Amino acid sequence: MLPHLPSVPTADELHRVRGIVDAARWSDGKITAGTQSAQVKNNRQLPQDCRESREAREIVLAALDRSALFVTGALPHRIFPPLFNRYEGSANAFGNHVDNSVRTDPLTREHTRTDVSCTLFLSAPEDYDGGELVIEDTFGCQTVKLPAGDMILYPSSSVHRVEPVTRGARIASFFWVQS
């Protein structure tokens, strides 16, 4: 069973993050994809160094700091700075892939081994159709579509994908943890 963490940010924090990222300019999501995953990645992403990304990231990190479930579920030694993605329109899916085993922060050049992948849903499930996170693990395929503010943790070595979004926008924060 994959750890599901309910209500990671407060309602106010979630509202603030959505206000920040909704007003931002999004880029092609391939900016952070590895060579192989770039072939199946089709979404939008906030540039890591933009003001909006930095502001939203600080709110997410503060929420993680307060979450006992996150600490016990991920055992974080290092957290790769949270990123933000958006699936809608023609940039609406991410095919089967495995996350890179090591991520390098382009701003600090620090390396993070990716033991645990984290997806924090920022859109309510009724705001979009499709967009399910499908994770293949030893127990089969698990389909995840959580309320805004909820987060799922899963092994970074798992094959996973985001199903096409056919209506609305699926917005999330995603990041990796070195345990």
Task: Describe each region flagged by the PLM.
Residues 1-83:
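Non-heme Fe(II)/2-oxoglutarate
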Residues 69-179:
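Catalytic core of non-heme Fe(II) oxygenases with the double-stranded beta-helix
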